């Protein structure tokens, strides 16, 4: 499945605009991981624990969105948007949305 942030796909004609599709993932933050991430930030390293959590949550949300688009008969998603939000108690939410299309 083609997934893009653009409003179209170069060289492809959109045959049908199907529906808006989305996916969400909420991940809890581990307190020990948070502590080590903070220490790495202070000494100038990258916060690998946070990066890993972000990637995992984004992948889950994207997979959910793609599956929904596939169920609706789409073979591409255009105009995707990815949003990150920290919700209460250190939980991380990743929400993705886009327009399911058939090309």
From Swiss-Prot:
TM stretches of this protein: none
Protein name, as recorded: UPF0145 protein BC_1816
Family according to the record: Belongs to the UPF0145 family.
Originating organism: Bacillus cereus (strain ATCC 14579 / DSM 31 / CCUG 7414 / JCM 2152 / NBRC 15305 / NCIMB 9373 / NCTC 2599 / NRRL B-3711)
């Amino acid at each position: 499945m083609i997934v893009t942030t653009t409003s179209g796909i170069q060289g492809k004609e959109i045959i049908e605009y199907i529906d808006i599709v989305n996916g969400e993932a909420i991940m809890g933050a581990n307190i020990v991981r948070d502590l080590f991430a903070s220490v790495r930030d202070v000494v100038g390293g990258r916060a690998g624990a946070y990066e890993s959590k972000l990637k995992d949550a984004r992948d889950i949300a994207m997979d959910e969105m793609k599956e929904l688009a596939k169920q609706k008969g789409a073979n591409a998603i255009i105009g995707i948007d990815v949003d990150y939000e920290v919700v209460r108690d250190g939980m991380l939410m990743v929400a993705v949305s886009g327009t399911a299309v058939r090309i």
